[in-house]
Amino acid sequence: MNQLIIRAIEERFKKSNIPDFKPGDTVKVHVKVKEGDKERIQVFEGVVIARRGGGLRETFTVRKISFGVGVERVFPLHSPIIDKIELVRRGDVRRAKLYYLRTKKGKEAKVKEKTDYQKA
């Protein structure tokens, strides 16, 4: 009974405009940033290295290299601070968690592009 109530409440807060992306895919996450009384959109582009959780509590981790330094950011999937998520390219990987990319440098850290998929 409690599960049904929780699931019904969670359905109201879930976002519907989330693209189907997996670890290895390159995404652009448009994040709302509040500075003082102003609000603007900041784009964070990188490779999805993990997705975890489920339902309303699902999160995903995006990694990018900025000025030679690896930057990772964890985003709640259904958070109101996320304006939109754009899928840039599909990655061809065989793992669900790509934490091994943290130790790779330069071209080693590249994820191969998947060629046999249908673009939406």
UniProtKB/Swiss-Prot annotation:
GO terms for molecular function: structural constituent of ribosome. Gene3D superfamilies: 2.30.30.790. The keyword Ribosomal protein applies. Keywords: Ribonucleoprotein, Ribosomal protein. GO terms for biological process: translation. GO terms for cellular component: cytosolic large ribosomal subunit. PROSITE patterns: RIBOSOMAL_L19. Pfam families: Ribosomal_L19. Belongs to the bacterial ribosomal protein bL19 family. NCBIfam families: rplS_bact. This protein is located at the 30S-50S ribosomal subunit interface and may play a role in the structure and function of the aminoacyl-tRNA binding site. PANTHER family: LARGE RIBOSOMAL SUBUNIT PROTEIN BL19M, RIBOSOMAL PROTEIN L19. This is Large ribosomal subunit protein bL19. It comes from Thermodesulfovibrio yellowstonii (strain ATCC 51303 / DSM 11347 / YP87).
